[in-house]
């Protein structure tokens, strides 16, 4: 079926990913680069609505934020990313372009893990905490701050009569892994994302009526129970 997969440990070896596993699929054959103001996929020349994205078998509307600079799932939660450009299972719906599946990572129970980051576009943080030898919880949040910088600039005189596009995005993830018994695992995963693009005019600048604000957001809550029956077979509910 011509599937292409990448594991999280391979990401740092690929150019242009900036440590984001989902950005790696742009290097796969048949993939088009994400355009500014679109977080959608371009697989083998198909329209974005002809492809689909799934996180742990739950479909989401977009893989990337509108800026195209980052995906909607933070890297610490990603175990693997797979692109299937054709011949995929009917359980993925009526997509004709391609399917991207993201598998989330089992949280470690050995120690506390975490980080915080700040760059030119956004700020975010992640923390993973073991609650016991069998239970671990992880949480992450990220938000861009270009709109805040823009507000400060406007408060100090703005940029004359300029009309500028100001993108804003955010996302969050909250995950609980519980090994209820040997070979049995309960996973609760809540995640969501939001994007907003707004045109702002300073001074006497007038907005073109065709320049409209663009909003998009989604939220998902998944509950999964998995039983490893042996010989490589599992039951998932």
Listing of model-derived features with the role each one plays in the protein:
Residues 68, 150-156, 190-193, 198-207:
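Outer-membrane beta-barrel translocator domains and adjoining extracellular loop/strand segments
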């Amino acid at each position: 079926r011509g599937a292409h997969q990448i594991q999280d440990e391979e990401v740092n070896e690929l150019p242009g990913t900036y440590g984001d596993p989902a950005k790696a699929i742009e290097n796969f054959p048949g993939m088009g680069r994400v355009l500014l103001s679109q977080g959608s996929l371009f697989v083998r020349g198909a329209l974005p609505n002809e492809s689909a994205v799934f996180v742990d078998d739950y479909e989401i509307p977009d893989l990337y934020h509108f800026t195209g600079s980052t995906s909607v799932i933070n890297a610490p939660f990603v175990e693997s990313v797979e692109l299937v450009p054709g011949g995929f299972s009917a359980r993925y719906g009526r997509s004709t372009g391609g399917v991207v599946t993201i598998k989330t990572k089992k949280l470690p129970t050995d120690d506390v893990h975490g980080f915080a980051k700040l760059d030119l576009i956004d700020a975010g943080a992640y923390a993973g905490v073991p609650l016991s030898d069998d239970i671990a919880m992880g949480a992450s949040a990220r938000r861009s701050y270009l709109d805040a910088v823009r507000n400060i600039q406007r408060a100090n005189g703005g940029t004359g009569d300029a009309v500028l596009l100001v993108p804003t995005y955010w996302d969050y993830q909250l995950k609980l892994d519980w090994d209820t018994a040997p070979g049995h695992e309960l996973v609760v995963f809540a995640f969501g994302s939001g994007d907003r693009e707004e045109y702002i005019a300073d001074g006497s600048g007038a907005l073109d009526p065709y320049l409209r604000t663009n909003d998009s957001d989604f939220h998902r809550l998944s509950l999964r129970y998995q039983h490893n029956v042996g010989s490589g077979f599992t039951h998932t509910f």
